[in-house]
Amino acid sequence: MSFNSNASKYQAENTVDKLFSNILHTSTTSKSVSKSKSKSKSKPKPISSTQLLVNQLQSTNTTANNNNTKRKKHNNNKRINKTLLEEKKFSKFIKYNHIKQKSNKSELDEKYLNKLVRKNINSLNKINKIDDLLIDEELNQIKQELLEENEFVGMGGGQLKGGKRLRKKLLNNTKQVIDEFDGFGEISSSNNNNKKKNSSHPGLTPGLAPVDYEEEDDE
């Protein structure tokens, strides 16, 4: 490239130098700005005490909400299970009454009744785990009566007693046997006297005889 004079050459060189200086200065400035931004991002900002308190409260509220949700879910499941259990018991009750009213019972009906008997006997065994000989005898007697009643129901008559009634009968019979037992294998005389006094005529207050009753009739 040729120049007409030294002045024009000098002017051109100055223009090129300014241009390069501007380019280099801009790039250097942008690099410094990016470095300062990266440094500011890398340094964590200090958290104030107020912000710490807010964060703790939010965490506590979240935990409390989770606990309330779990408790509500547990109660809801418990309510559902209780409803299902009641419906199941009611359906079993309906099924039992339907089978009980049949004159001719099928093999499946007999199996279902036997299952009820076994279930009631198992309930008695769980409630009455006592080694006393007298109570065991009473328990065996109740079991035998339950089996006989089931056979009668299977033939089209009678009703199968529930576990609650059997338990009550068992407790009453056991209490009576224990009260009458004097420890020597005999019934106490006082209880025998009470039985004689209470064995009066039917339909009357114990100890009272009929109006037309006469002592000569006993002779």
Swiss-Prot record:
It is found in: Nucleus, Nucleolus. The keyword Lipid biosynthesis does not apply. Coiled coil: none annotated. Keywords: Nucleus, Transcription, Transcription regulation. Residues 27-51, 60-79, 184-219 are annotated as: Disordered. GO terms for cellular component: nucleolus. InterPro entries: Rrt14 (IPR031404). Belongs to the RRT14 family. This is Regulator of rDNA transcription 14. It comes from Candida albicans (strain WO-1) (Yeast).
